Amino acid sequence: MKRAIWLVVSFALLTTPVAWAQERPVTIRYLGWSFFLVTTADGVRIAMDPYGNIGYPFPTVEADVVTVSHEHGDHNNVGLVKGSPRVFRGLATGAADWNRFYERFGSTLVYSVAAFHDDVQGTSPRGLNVLFVIVTDGLRIAHLGDIGQPALTDGQLRALGTIDVLMIPVGDGPFTVTIPQASALVAQIRPKVVIPMHYKTPTRQPPTWPGVDERPFLEGKQNVRRLGSHTLTISRDQLPSTTQIVVMEHQ
C-alpha cells in the first residue's frame, strides 16, 4: 500500500513546472553500459549509474551529483566518481522502498520517479528501480536505469513530463525490458532523441552475458544516427522534429 500511495501521489508533486533557462548546449558523455556524464551549460555535472568491474575501463570522472537507479554492481559504483558529489541512491537501505529526490542545483533540477526492475511490480528478486530526470537549459533528459516494466503508468508519464532525450536499455534483458518492450516504451514516452544503453559490446564482461548488442533494437527503425563519438552536445533548438535514435560510442 505504501508503494501504491507514493506511486499515485508523488508523481503529481514531481510535475511542478520548471522555468526553463536560456537554451544553451548540454553535453552528454557516454562512458559505456548505462553510465553517462551530463554536463549543463552552467557546468553542473551529473554522473548516472556508474558501472563496477564489468570489463569497461574506469575513466576519470568528476561530478557534482551521482544518480543510482538501483543497487546492482554494474550501476552503483559511486566510488568511481571523483570530487565530493551528492549521491542520489534511488533505493532505500535494503532496496525495499524508493528514495525520493527533487533538488535544484542552480537552474538545473534533478528528480526521481519510482519504477520497477521487473514486470511484476517489484515482487521478483529484481525488485525496484528508479528513473532519474534532469531538467536544464530547456531540455528534459530521462535515464530509465534497469527498467523492467513493459509499460509506464499514466502517473509515471505525467511525472516524466515531455522528455527530449531518453536513455533506455536495449540489450533484450534478461534484467531489463525486452527489445519489443523497449520499442513500446519509446513509442509511449515519445522523446525527441533516444540513446540506447545497457547492450552487449566486445568490452562487456563476462562474454557469456546473455544480452544482445544494439542492432536488434535498431532493426526496422527510422532516423537512426551513429554518432561515431562518445560525446553528444545538444541544445533545445537542435532537437529533431521526429524521434531520432542516436547510437553513441562508449569512451
Annotate the PLM regions:
Residues 65, 69-76, 80-81, 198:
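Histidine-centered divalent metal-coordination motifs
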Residues 99, 189-251:
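Binuclear metal-ion centers of metallo-dependent hydrolases, dominated by the metallo-beta-lactamase
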Residues 76-77, 150-153, 174-180, 202-209:
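Extracytoplasmic/secreted cell-surface and envelope-processing proteins
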Residues 22-65, 73, 86-161, 165, ...:
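Core dinuclear metal-dependent hydrolase active-site scaffold
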Residues 63, 164-168, 179-199:
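Proline-aspartate-enriched helix->loop->beta-strand connector
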Residues 1-4:
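Positively charged n-region of N-terminal signal peptides that target proteins for export
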Residues 6-16:
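Bacterial N-terminal signal peptides
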Residues 17-21:
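Sec/Tat signal peptide C-region and signal peptidase I cleavage site
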